[in-house]
From Swiss-Prot:
Enzyme Commission code: 2.7.14.1
Organism: Staphylococcus saprophyticus subsp. saprophyticus (strain ATCC 15305 / DSM 20229 / NCIMB 8711 / NCTC 7292 / S-41)
PANTHER family tied to this protein: ARGININE KINASE 1-RELATED, ARGININE OR CREATINE KINASE
Catalytic activity: L-arginyl-[protein] + ATP = N(omega)-phospho-L-arginyl-[protein] + ADP + H(+)
NCBIfam families the UniProt entry points to: PRK01059.1-3
One GO BP: phosphocreatine biosynthetic process
Binding site for ATP: 25-29, 83, 116, 167-171, 198-203
Protein name: Protein-arginine kinase
Task of the protein: Catalyzes the specific phosphorylation of arginine residues in proteins.
Gene: mcsB
SUPFAM superfamilies on file: Glutamine synthetase/guanido kinase
Family statement drawn from the similarity comment of this UniProt entry: Belongs to the ATP:guanido phosphotransferase family.
A GO cellular component entry from the record: extracellular space
GO molecular function: ATP binding; creatine kinase activity; protein kinase activity
Length: 336
């Protein structure tokens, strides 16, 4: 898989930004349900599910629809790897995703709620992402009968989403805080203020490559602007702590950190078999070394490699190499 091949897999909003070494991406997600339809988790029939898909498609004709029942498993999991759909959407019998041209907008149909509107970007621009998601929300609201209560707000399947129905989240690369074992303390602290830390694919997912998703937990009684402002403040505090820890590692643990970086670089350069878990760890430590200016690598794309080394992009019926072997081959080709 060449560097051009990797870039072809990526949505534009997922690409690396040199000016943002810690913030990988941001997302605004709005949960909505439709009146006169059974909720997806309450035995939604395939017939009703496909009827909802058609209604949403008619309301948003400018977006491309992909029905998951028409896709093979590998194609579905590629969408998961690119953060365009959730693993939960795959498990629904009648589900779909609508995407705009650059894939910065994704509308999941018949996941936990009838609609999950997602706007995504590769910086900390939560307010502009909310405006983007809100524009789609307004279009749907003008065409469809969306469930809304004057007292409670938007009615959702999960009680924690009732109110604005909004989840704001930011993906951060936090190797310093992880190495110094600070993440549990941070998780406990922000939890008291209504925020949570999850893995790379949200609730219940594993942490790979020292990448964490920070998001709000509750929406009832808060405005969208309140949630965005509070999350932005929390994220900035975490970024500041990560920068302080990196400075400490550089000053007081220089040799140990340098050794960690070069060991990982050597494994990526020379391994012939490597698992997803180890590959993401080694990529993270090499990225830390680049950020601390210990090493220079030409055209090192952390975000893109973290997607490209996932199994859905490595499976090929015409190639008898194992996934771990192909992953190692890709990394050797790109780490120079």
């Amino acid at each position: 898989m060449s560097k051009n091949d990797i870039s072809a897999y990526m949505s534009e909003w997922m690409r690396d930004r040199e000016e943002s070494p810690i913030v990988m991406s941001s997302r605004i997600r709005l949960a909505r349900n439709l009146e006169n339809h059974v909720h997806p988790l309450m035995f939604l029939s395939e017939q009703d599910g496909f009827r909802i898909i058609n209604e949403v498609q008619d309301a948003l004709p400018d977006l491309a629809v992909q029905r998951l029942d028409a896709m093979d498993q590998q194609s579905k999991y590629k969408l998961v790897a690119k953060h365009l759909i959730s693993p939960e959407l795959i498990r629904q019998p009648a589900s779909a995703v609508l995407l705009n041209e650059d894939e910065s907008l994704s509308i999941m149909v018949n996941e936990e709620d009838h609609l999950r509107i997602q706007a995504m970007g590769n910086d900390l621009s939560l307010s502009s992402l909310y405006e983007k998601a809100s524009e789609i929300d307004d279009k749907l609201d003008s065409e469809l009968d969306v469930s809304f209560d004057e007292t409670l707000g938007y009615l959702t399947t999960c009680p924690t989403n009732i109110g604005t129905g909004m989840r704001a989240s930011v993906m951060l690369h936090l190797p310093g805080l992880t190495i110094m074992k600070r993440m549990n303390r941070i998780a406990q602290t922000i939890n008291r203020f209504g925020f949570t830390i999850r893995g790379i694919y949200g609730e219940g997912s594993h942490v790979y490559g020292h990448i964490y998703q920070i998001s709000n937990q509750l929406t009832l009684g808060k405005t969208e602007e309140d949630i965005i402002e509070s999350l932005s403040e929390v994220v900035q505090q975490i970024i500041n702590e990560e920068m302080q820890i990196r400075e400490r590692l550089n000053r007081h643990n220089y040799t140990e950190t340098l050794d960690r970086v070069y060991r990982s670089l050597g494994i990526l350069k020379y391994s012939r078999l490597i698992s997803m878990e180890e590959a993401s760890l080694r990529l993270s430590e090499v990225k830390l070394g680049i950020d601390l200016e210990y090493i220079e690598l030409e055209d090192f794309k952390f975000n893109e490699l973290m997607v490209a080394i996932q199994s859905p992009f490595l499976l090929d019926d015409e190639d008898d190499r194992t996934v771990n072997e192909k992953r190692a081959d890709i990394l050797r080709e790109h780490i120079n």
